[in-house]
Amino acid sequence: MAGHSQFKNIMHRKGRQDAVKSKMFSKLAREITVAAKAGLPDPAMNPRLRLAVQNARAQSMPKDNIERAIKKAQGNDAETYEEIRYEGYAPGGVAVIVEALTDNRNRTASNVRAAFTKAGGALGETGSVSFMFDRVGEIVYPASAGDADKVMEAAIEAGAEDVQSDENGHVIICAFEDIGEVTSALEEALGEAESVKTVWRPQTSTPVDEERAQSILKLIAVLEDDDDVQNVYANFEVDDATMAKLSAA
């Protein structure tokens, strides 16, 4: 029976992974549709759409899905999505920013507020925590793009502000308004990036213990599980040993 049990566990895990991938594709498709509707349906002529398509490809989203999302924006029956930012505090006074694309503002606000309340946090007003973050461009390259020195040199030449390199790859940070220019310059030097996006980068991080970290990670997981939520950012910090323990749980 042990073998049967193991098979069931593997299939359950695969099912969970497939569900996560399906939800991710759905969110990527929504961003593509919104980007295509906001400008031209040609990625070459629409920087936001180009980035959305590039990020979808980096996540192995099928070409048919990408094309369908672009075409959806051109139809008369295309949903109208609104970009909304929610801000609040998780347990321990940790600041959280939630970015959403929604066709029903009331539904999304209700879901986000409920998630904060259940976690022991509180949803605040727009602007209540965003001053603790910087809006920046984040360009990610795989380790195969080159060693740290090569990537650092290319990033400086491109006008980036910061580079973080490790065995997993390279994360390049640039000013929000420079993301298009920096991305193009990096492509010439290093090829196409793995992902390009704008993010909210914490100016400082709040250290939290294992119990608080568990509550915060649970809140983030609940928020990210919502179909309307695109991104979640938080300014907390956990030591490596605690994070490894929580990841293994």
UniProtKB/Swiss-Prot annotation:
Domain of life: Bacteria
CC per GO annotation: cytosol
GO biological process, alphabetically ordered: regulation of DNA-templated transcription
Keywords assigned by UniProt, alphabetized: Cytoplasm, DNA-binding, Transcription, Transcription regulation
Location within or outside the cell: Cytoplasm
Entries under InterPro entries matching the protein: Integrase-like_N, TACO1_YebC-like_2nd/3rd_dom, TACO1_YebC_N, Transcrip_reg_TACO1-like, Transcrip_reg_TACO1-like_dom3, YebC-like
Pfam families per the UniProt record, alphabetical: TACO1_YebC_N, Transcrip_reg
Major location (coarse): cytoplasm
Signal sequence, renumbered to the chain: none
MF terms in GO: DNA binding
Family stated for the protein in its record: Belongs to the TACO1 family.
PANTHER family the UniProt entry points to: TRANSCRIPTIONAL REGULATORY PROTEIN YEBC-RELATED, TRANSLATIONAL ACTIVATOR OF CYTOCHROME C OXIDASE 1
Protein name from the UniProt record: Probable transcriptional regulatory protein Meso_3192
Organism annotation: Chelativorans sp. (strain BNC1)
